[in-house]
């Protein structure tokens, strides 16, 4: 059910605890605070006229002035390419230093849309628990990046490949409980029907797939473990209703791309062995042994010494440590949907509604 603040607000007013009540609603995270400050900055930009739309032939001075609205470190003396590279990194683009089509598109997103993105991401922070496990794995689906936290501090990150807009990776939280070394791939029926069965049995056999009977009398496709398995050499399992997981991949080309939303929904990892080693480091019998286990070519499940929390999140706006805002595209249109819900909710707010639930004031 949607959170209804009116009962607790009425109680806070009656008990003269309004400041404490308001403070309790704010997510206790630097990520949220960075967005809150960013929102104020972008609202100020909007209130002073926003920014003009740039053309591909815009002069260097016009481009520099546009960049300076979001990046206060832009100066008139530094090369324009350096300022463009900073902007491209903030937008998750290839930092060529050129005003290419993707950069132009990002710069021409309206300030109102940037504000809507910030507000949508602030709302997602409100969905988070009040405390996060200090040791955890976080995947930013929109940015296709995995970050490992230990002691509540980021210790390593790697590129990932997340779900395409038509095969979306879900937002969820769970716990990684085990790693499958040299996993076979039990091909989901949706993929088998659309992509594999149409190739014909002979082609599938040549490509190393096996067709096996199901208990119900049907057929399914299995790709045996090995260097060419779609799951690579490692699969990280966690309970969830979407049948998604983290895994290795033999197809490494996408990791050098800045457009990495290309999977069927699971998350492919750039450095799976490094991630596995971090997860088993506290077990002397497993620490440093992941590659040796892979080299046996045997399929085996390794239970983790302790389960590791995993969060699949969708951040399209976030602040750097210096307060500069970063943005990513909204490939699933989740920002757009959430912005519509936020706007609809704000229209439904009745500023007098609290009076209907508040107790009579005491003398």
Regions found by a protein language model. Give the residues of each.
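Well-ordered beta-sheet/strand-loop patches within structured domains
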Residues: 3-7, 11, 17-363
């Amino acid at each position: 059910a949607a959170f209804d603040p009116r009962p607790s607000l009425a109680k806070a007013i009656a008990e003269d605890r309004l400041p404490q009540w308001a403070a309790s609603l704010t997510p206790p995270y630097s990520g949220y605070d960075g967005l809150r400050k960013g929102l104020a900055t972008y609202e100020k930009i909007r209130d002073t006229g926003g920014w003009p739309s740039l053309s591909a032939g815009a002069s260097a001075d016009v481009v520099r002035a546009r960049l300076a609205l979001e990046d206060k470190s832009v100066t008139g003396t530094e090369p324009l390419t350096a300022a463009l590279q900073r902007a491209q990194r903030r937008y998750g683009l290839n930092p060529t230093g050129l005003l290419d089509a993707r950069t132009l598109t990002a710069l021409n997103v309206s300030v109102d849309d940037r504000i809507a993105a910030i507000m949508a991401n602030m709302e997602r922070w409100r969905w988070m628990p009040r405390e996060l496990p200090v040791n955890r794995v976080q995947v930013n689906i929109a940015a296709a990046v995995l970050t490992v936290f230990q002691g509540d501090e980021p210790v390593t990150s790697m590129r990932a490949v997340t779900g395409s807009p038509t095969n979306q990776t879900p937002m969820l939280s769970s716990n990684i409980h085990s790693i499958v070394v040299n996993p076979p791939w039990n091909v989901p029926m949706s993929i088998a029907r659309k992509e594999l069965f149409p190739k014909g049995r002979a082609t599938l056999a040549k490509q190393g797939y096996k067709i096996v009977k199901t208990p119900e009398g049907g057929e399914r496709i299995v790709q045996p473990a090995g260097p060419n398995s779609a799951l690579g050499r490692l699969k990280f399992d966690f309970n969830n209703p979407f049948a998604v997981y983290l895994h290795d991949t033999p197809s490494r080309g996408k990791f050098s791309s800045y457009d990495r939303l290309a999977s069927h929904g699971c998350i492919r990892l750039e450095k799976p062995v490094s991630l596995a080693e971090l997860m088993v480091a506290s077990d002397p019998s497993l620490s440093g042994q992941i590659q040796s286990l892979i080299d046996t070519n045997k399929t085996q499940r390794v239970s983790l010494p302790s389960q590791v929390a995993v969060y699949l999140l969708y951040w399209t706006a976030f602040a750097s440590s210096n307060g500069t805002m970063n943005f990513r595209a909204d490939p699933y249109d989740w920002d757009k949907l959430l912005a519509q819900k936020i706007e609809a909710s704000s229209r439904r707010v009745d500023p007098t509604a609290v009076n209907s639930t508040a107790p009579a004031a005491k003398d």
